[in-house]
Every structure is written in structure tokens, then in C-alpha cells.
Amino acid sequence: MNLYEMIIDENELMSGVNALSLVESPAIGSDWVALGDQKPILLAEVNADKQILMGAALIPDKPIYRNMNGEEFYIYFSEETVAKAAEMFFKRSNQSNATLEHSQPLKGMTVFESWIVDNPEFDKSKQYGLDVPKGTWVVSMKVDDKDIWDNYIKNNKVFGFSIEGAFSNVLRSESAEDIGLSDQLLDGALDLIRTFIKENIN
């Protein structure tokens, strides 16, 4: 199965991440933490319901399964591309661009905090229960729309972020295992199984 690296062409105006979407099944296999419901003890009395989401926007070197018109393949983002995507997201003032399931534009959504994980063991995201590798792009999003929070976040209709944007691709291998990503592929397969169970066994 072909493996493509996704890259950013800085000469293309639309290249990179243009928006974040709230989705039921994040392709990167990482759910968010709803800080209105799960608060660290030190902040528990500050605000009962902050309506803030924290989660991974992009995880580096993690193969993501794709099927387009019957063609199956994997894509991945390098650590360098993840960092560049995060930087350009803010440079182009896209922090208020959000959608629901990649279809419905949302208002009142703002990414106010963003960072690249340097040391997973001591990263801020760890205290909120996120377990992501070095190089992951983590964001915090304020949800000002109470209807979205109540109907989709609190009711567990969406579970994570999914990026929207345009990327170029480079074929890196006709077999993902050739570049030493077999463990990540196994993780990706497990994520697909978990998604199937979540969607079909309720």
C-alpha cells in the first residue's frame, strides 16, 4: 500500500491548515479533553464550565489510512511539517475558522492556545490526560456557542479535531513498512477498529 508524505508549499496561498473541524472520528486517533467537564484540581473552583477543548490537531509520523475512489493508501505528516502548519495557521489568522464534521461552518470558536510538544512526559497536555508523542501540535479552543457545547460536546457527538487544508504529497514508499513505520501502522489499524466499534456497537 502506498505511503505519501504530506508537505506544505509555502508559495501556495491555501497550502497548510485553514480550519479545524469538530468530528466524531478524528483521523489522527486522538480525542480531546473537554475542560469544562475535566478540570485539574487547582482550577476546579475558578470556573465551573469554561467551555474549552484541548486536543491534538496533528500528530507527526503517524500513518493515516485513506480510501479515495477505491484506492487505499496512507498519508503522514513529518515533525517539520506539523510545526510549519501550526505556525502558518496563526500567521494567516485562521484561529477562528472552525467547522462541524467538515461541512457546517461554526462561529464563536477560537483557538487561543497552541504549542508543539517538546517533552511528552512533562508537557502541559499530560496533566489533562492527553498522551501524545514529541512534535504533536496541541491546541486549546474556546467554544462560545453554548448550543454547540451542549448539543455536541456534552452529548458526546464529536470527540476530536480534524484539520482542513491543502497539502502537496510525495510518494515515500510503496510499502509503509519499508520506512520503519510498522508499529505506527499497527496503531493506525487499532484506531480504525476502535472507530468501527464506536460507530457500530452502541
Regions found by a protein language model. Name each.
Residues 1-199:
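Signature of dsDNA virion morphogenesis modules
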Residues 202:
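Active-site-adjacent segment of 2-oxoglutarate/Fe(II) JmjC oxygenases
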